[in-house]
Swiss-Prot record:
Descriptive protein name: Lon protease homolog, mitochondrial
Taxonomic path: Eukaryota, Viridiplantae, Streptophyta, Embryophyta, Tracheophyta
Binding site for ATP: 455-462
Stretches for region Disordered: 663-740
Comp. bias (Basic and acidic residues): 688-698
Pfam families: AAA, Lon_C, Lon_lid, LON_substr_bdg
Entry GO CC: mitochondrial matrix
């Protein structure tokens, strides 16, 4: 008997098959017999008795086998209670779709109290509950199913809160099965909630709803039902969801009455829950049919769309398969005829052809590796990952320029010409480079020292490297190591890694196509260091001429001869370069450009190139020398000329805007610019070109910029044209012709020192000379900064005077070294004053305040020692120092003057401030003598060994110190 009950339950597994049986007009279903009934038109009948009898027999059989689990039940439910007597039911929330009469719906009940109540109902032979759809929360889309989150929030609701979230109209459902928390419901008839009876579990009073009376023979009703039946049959035929039961459904669908037909159509549709709830709530059968017709029509359109998409995809897949098969057949036919070889043979032939021309120059160990890899390639399947790795490896091995060298040019006169073409000034740097080339001419090769160009940003280090490559007729390749922290960037990845690649040097050789390029390693002082190793240590093997003969890249894993490669490095601060690397380099310092050199560069190179780049003709604009001089001295004091180029570009952009507003239209100048270098770009490949003419010494790598600008002034002047420019603009507009010619009569735009601020804003740097005649206690010193040289005033003032209370107060953001220099200066000054004026007790009785403007700028260094002594003595004796005098030098406790650095920069700063007399340490005389004559011209320079000589120069007019 138990087996019979289980068999009966198995027959109920397909929900829609059971629906067919329940929805027919009182005629028993062949599939379900009389085991299930449709609740809306049944009372205590023979069907109920049969169901009860079958269930009783099943329970007796299960009791005979053993005690059943309390939470489990068979699919056949005893229903001794009359369904019309169900006026108070437990409310079950349905989160996703309403339950229609005649349909089964499985739900999960997480609330143990509710689950226990359902089990108790079944035991009392009253297995009924009310199933009500849950309303959406405000602001949610009913078309989006929120899943377990919404179910969890519903489970937390109790009593009135849950009642508010339920739709009033639901379905009286029979509890057909309970397995754990899994409950299966069978819908019977429509209900409406009237009031709440109990809060937990939620129990409500309900009214049983009946359809409104209708005329079965109404033509409109019949036509609508026929259309619904026709559409349903079409949906069932086209939908993949019901394809296994198409024959059964379409056979019995015509037997449904109107109300059950409407419920059936709405239940199998994929409409959202609100539309389905609307069908459930509709008691007018005709309106319900119309609503269902809309839903099934939409379902049919969706089914057709789904079918068309599936068909298109299937056709595409079959078409691709057909093409693939035809291609394979074609390959096989060609192979049989000898017209085509397979991929592996073609690849091997390509690699052998590449290496054939280099066989005589290629090292034997490399040829051996290539042959081994070619043999390995033939044994691998083309679809394997190892095949791809081997193919890429062979590609790199065969593409490298083994033994291919470019012819070098060691002509010193040719090199001198190129260096002069590309750069103005820098005579000492050019001389060092020519010496290097001369040694290469005598040796026949440039193998040897590694050049390191050091200097501030914008002085032309990178472009000098290009010029050397042009002079030697070598290919040029640049890569920056600034911030590089991965050794694999230099030495490559091992082939075992996915996506492995060779290092930069192997990529360089492939890019330039020669084995002796000039490689510029930019920003070598900014090498990083991370968990992936130390790149500085990896560069040791690369740069050392004794080791790079057999440089081993991790990817290639064969020795490569890099001894013919000329390496040029650039750095801003050589102190940041690791000592083992620095020891292998020949340092060439590039101090920067003086004002005269900047004037020539701006006039001959920068202005000309910028004017052409902006499309402006020479007759349309004039930038005077006074404007360029003011631009250099008041806006661009840095050692390089990169910022000067930016300011000139800003001027010409504003001029271009004025000309366009005046209606000027120039034909573009078509100038061919050819390049002879290969330069690394961010992530792209390098390119090799010929005969580049680079005349802009400011062109250097863009990864380091250290220019001082005034952002506020720049922004303001970028947005507004000047009043002077506006006047010229209006004047030019007044002079325009009316004949429509391309070149219209305009007034020439002139930029001079008077209107320079209208184009580039207010000056960034103010005049360094504060005093025309230095007062008592004030002396001008000379300092070195990152921007070059500058003048520096030392000011002293007596704060108070009390016997025996001599002291020194320091301000001006002085560093530790400068504070120590001030203490030494105070001691030495006291000794000098005691020697010169024994009766003057100024230092013993006076508290002196020493200040170094500007207060916001940090300052440090020992070179202001002699200036501090002179300032204190001037205050102590009440004498001002000699006019137009500036000095620099470190002083010892015994009054000796020690050498300092930055002689060139400090001399330029003195000339800029119109200083005529300079005092330097005697040890710096050689540095001063090496300066260009135009830098030294017009200066009276004294070189001193002791402070007593400075005292005579500063406070007496009959000094006899050595003068230059």
């Amino acid at each position: 008997m138990l087996r019979a009950a289980v068999a009966a339950a198995e027959e109920l597994r397909s929900p829609l098959l059971r629906v067919i049986g329940t929805l027919r007009d009182g005629r028993g279903s062949v599939l379900l017999g009389r085991r299930v009934r449709f609740c809306s038109n049944s009372s205590a009948s023979d069907t109920e008795a049969a169901v009860a009898e079958a269930e009783a027999k099943a329970e007796d059989a299960s009791a005979a086998e053993g005690e059943a689990d309390s939470k489990a039940s068979s699919a056949i439910v005893p229903t001794s209670t009359n369904i019309d007597d169900c006026l108070s039911v437990i409310a079950l929330p349905l989160p996703h779709r309403p339950l229609f009469p005649g349909f089964y719906m499985p739900i999960n009940v997480k609330d143990q109290k509710l689950l226990q109540a359902l089990i108790e109902n079944r035991k009392r032979s009253a297995p009924y509950a009310g199933a009500f759809l849950v309303k959406d929360e405000e602001g949610t889309d009913p078309n989006i199913v929120t899943g377990s989150d919404s179910a969890k929030s519903i489970d937390d609701l109790k009593g009135k809160d849950l009642l508010k979230r339920l739709h009033e109209v639901g379905t009286l459902a029979q509890i057909t099965s309970i397995q754990g928390d899994h409950v299966v419901l069978l819908g019977h008839r429509r209900l409406r909630i009237t009031e709440m009876v109990e809060e937990d579990p939620l129990t409500v009073k309900v009214d049983h709803l009946k359809e409104k009376p209708y005329n079965k023979d109404d033509d409109v009703m019949k036509a609508t039902s026929f259309e619904v039946i026709s559409t349903l049959r079409e949906v069932l035929r086209t939908s993949s969801l019901w394809k296994d039961h198409v024959q059964t459904y379409t056979q019995h669908i015509g037997d449904f009455n109107y109300q059950r037909l409407a419920d059936f159509g709405a239940a199998i549709s994929g409409a959202n829950k609100l539309l389905c709830q609307e069908v459930l709530e509709e008691l007018d059968v005709y309106k319900r049919l119309k609503l269902t017709l809309e839903l099934v029509k939409k379902e049919m359109e969706i089914s057709k769309l789904q079918q068309s998409i599936a068909k298109a995809i299937e056709e595409k897949i079959s078409g691709d398969q057909r093409r693939y098969l035809l291609n394979e057949q074609l390959k096989a036919i060609k192979k049989e005829l000898g017209l085509e070889t397979d991929d592996k043979t073609a690849l091997s032939a390509k690699f052998r052809e590449r290496i054939e021309s280099k066989k005589d120059k290629c090292p034997p160990h490399v040829l051996q590796v290539i042959e081994e890899e070619l043999t390995k390639l033939q044994l691998l399947e083309a679809s394997s990952s190892e095949f791809s790795v081997t193919r890429n490896y062979l590609d790199w091995l065969t593409v490298l320029p083994w033994g291919n060298y470019s012819d070098e040019n060691f002509d010193v006169h040719h090199a001198q010409k190129i260096l002069d073409e590309d750069h103005y000034g820098l005579s000492d740097v050019k001389e060092r480079i020519l010496e290097f080339i001369a040694v290469g001419k005598l040796r026949g090769t440039s193998q040897g020292k590694i050049i390191c160009l050091s200097g501030p940003p914008g002085v032309g280090k990178t472009s000098i490297g290009r010029s050397i490559a042009r002079a030697l007729n070598r290919q040029f390749y640049r890569f920056s190591v600034g911030g590089l922290a991965d050794v694999a960037e230099i030495k490559g990845h091992r082939r075992t890694y996915v996506g492995a690649m060779p290092g930069k040097m192997v990529q360089c050789l492939k890019s330039v196509g020669t084995a002796n390029p000039l490689v510029l390693i930019d920003e070598i002082d900014k090498l990083g260091k991370g968990h992936s190793g130390d790149p500085a240590s990896a560069l040791l093997e690369l740069l050392d001429p004794e080791q790079n003969v057999n440089f081993l890249d991790h990817y290639l894993d064969v020795p490569i001869d890099l001894s013919k490669v000329l390496f040029v490095c650039t750095a801003n601060v050589i102190e940041m370069i690791p000592n083992p690397l620095l020891d292998r380099m020949e340092i060439i310092a590039i101090a920067g450009y003086i004002t005269d050199e900047k004037m020539h560069i701006a006039r001959d190179y920068l202005e000309k190139n910028t004017r052409q780049a902006c499309g402006i003709k020479p007759e349309q604009v004039e930038v005077t020398d006074t404007a360029l001089l003011a631009l250099i001295e008041n806006y661009c004091r840095e050692a390089g000329v990169r910022n000067l180029q930016k300011q000139i570009e800003k001027i010409y952009r504003k001029i271009a805007l004025q000309l366009v507003r005046q209606g000027v239209s120039n034909e573009p100048d078509h100038e061919s610019v050819s390049a002879s270098v290969t330069e690394e770009s961010g992530n792209g490949d390098n390119t090799t070109t010929k005969d580049e003419i680079l005349k802009d010494p400011a062109v250097e790598d863009a990864s380091v910029t250290n220019n001082v600008t005034n952002p506020a002034s720049e922004e303001a002047n970028e947005e507004n044209l000047t009043s002077e420019a506006a006047k010229e603009d209006s004047t030019s507009k007044g002079n325009k012709g009316t004949d429509g010619a391309a070149d219209k009569a305009i007034e020439k735009v002139v930029v001079d020192s008077s209107n320079l601020g209208d184009f580039v804003g207010k000056p960034v740097f103010q005049a360094e000379r504060i005093y025309e005649h230095t007062p008592v206690g004030v002396v001008m010193g000379l300092a070195w900064t990152a921007m070059g040289g500058s003048t520096l005033y030392i000011e002293t003032k007596k704060v108070e005077e009390r016997e025996g209370k001599g002291a020194l107060v320091l301000t001006g953001q002085l560093g530790d070294v400068m504070k120590e220099s001030a203490q030494i200066a105070h001691t030495v000054g006291r000794a000098v004053l005691l020697e010169k004026e024994p009766d003057n007790h100024f230092f013993a009785n006076s508290k002196v305040h020493l200040h170094v403007p500007a207060g916001s700028t940090p300052k440090d260094g020992p070179s202001a020692g002699c200036t501090m002594i002179t300032s204190m003595l001037s205050l102590a004796m009440g004498k001002p120092v000699k006019k137009d005098l500036a000095m620099t030098g470190e002083v010892t406790l015994t009054g000796r003057i020690l050498p300092i650095g930055g002689v060139k920069e400090k001399t330029i700063a003195a000339r800029r401030s119109a200083i005529k007399t300079l005092i330097f340490p005697a040890a710096n005389k050689r540095d001063f003598d090496e300066l260009a004559s135009n830098v030294k011209e017009g200066l009276e320079v004294h070189f001193v060994d002791t402070y007593s000589e400075i005292y005579d120069l500063a406070f007496q007019s009959d000094a006899g110190t050595e003068t230059s």
